[in-house]
Amino acid sequence: MSVEEEVFRIQKKMSKMASDGTGQDQALDLLKALQTLNINLDILTKTRIGMTVNELRKSSKDDEVIALAKTLIKNWKRFLASPAPTTPNNSSAKEGSSNNSSASKSTSAAKSSSSISGKDKSSSSSSSKDKEKKGSTSSSQTSFPSGGMTDAVRIKCREMLATALKIGEVPEGCGEPEEMAAELEDAIYSEFNNTDMKYKNRIRSRVANLKDPKNPGLRGNFMCGAVTAKQLAKMTPEEMASDEMKKLREKFVKEAINDAQLATVQGTKTDLLKCAKCKKRNCTYNQLQTRSADEPMTTFVMCNECGNRWKFC
């Protein structure tokens, strides 16, 4: 098994530990296994093991696990802070100079040195291209202003909220979407003090409601300050719903109440009332006092043929 495959295997186990808290007794052994592996910057980038170890450190209560996790993260950060190693160009230049000095002694040695330097130059150019690609990838991933934030999960959630706030036109005089998104994410994080599933579900519900094209009022009220970040962080789905959805829910509630009233009271059959839907005179009606005592009673009618219901006073 290669180093990269071994790191992937350990990363999966640690991710499960950090998410559901199971298997914490194996955390120390896994960290020690990582300490023995020869992990380079390429493996760190592909496996994202650094983020996983950091999440495990936050969720663990074992001092030894926390200390070893900090040590690993500190060692891996040196890959980012260390200066670029000597490129093959420098070594090829030295080899070229030594070969040039000995060129007068042997023509064949000069030819071999020139071929070696040519290979070194091609390898150095390919390595520089790879570094440029990695640099462009890392810069695109960190395009969102983190504001000192180091938690990758929280940064990603802020990006999602900012994207939702940018939908449609931003009213003049309102805050910047990135700043408003950071403020909202911070308010949600303060509710849970971690990035578990409850935190992520809260983020998803805010993103869905802010992106809803039928609910521009919520987005506008938040951007203009009518609704604060703390209020939006605690709102229920009913409170975030659009006016149209609130009216629809109110209508459904009233209809359900009426249906329940008709179902609980045994009606009186009559052929005096005609159904407007099927035109037949096979109905059952009830009379209930739905308003004040001095007002006439409301008659609820149900057609026994087609199930159509209506009421009148």
UniProtKB/Swiss-Prot annotation:
Alphabetical list of InterPro entries matching this protein: TF_IIS-typ, TFIIS/CRSP70_N_sub, TFIIS/LEDGF_dom_sf, TFIIS_cen_dom, TFIIS_cen_dom_sf, TFIIS_N, TFSII, Znf_TFIIS
Disulfide bonds: none
Pfam families: Med26, TFIIS_M, Zn_ribbon_TFIIS
Alphabetized PROSITE patterns for the sequence: TFIIS_CENTRAL, TFIIS_N, ZF_TFIIS_1, ZF_TFIIS_2
Region (Disordered): 83-150
Superkingdom field: Eukaryota
Domain TFIIS N-terminal: 5-83
Composition-biased stretches (Low complexity): 91-117, 136-148
GO CC terms in record: nucleus
SMART domains found in the cross-reference section: TFS2M, TFS2N, ZnF_C2C2
Membrane-spanning residues: none
Localization in the cell: Nucleus
Purpose of the protein: Necessary for efficient RNA polymerase II transcription elongation past template-encoded arresting sites. The arresting sites in DNA have the property of trapping a certain fraction of elongating RNA polymerases that pass through, resulting in locked ternary complexes. Cleavage of the nascent transcript by S-II allows the resumption of elongation from the new 3'-terminus.
Record-given protein name: Transcription elongation factor S-II
Gene: TfIIS
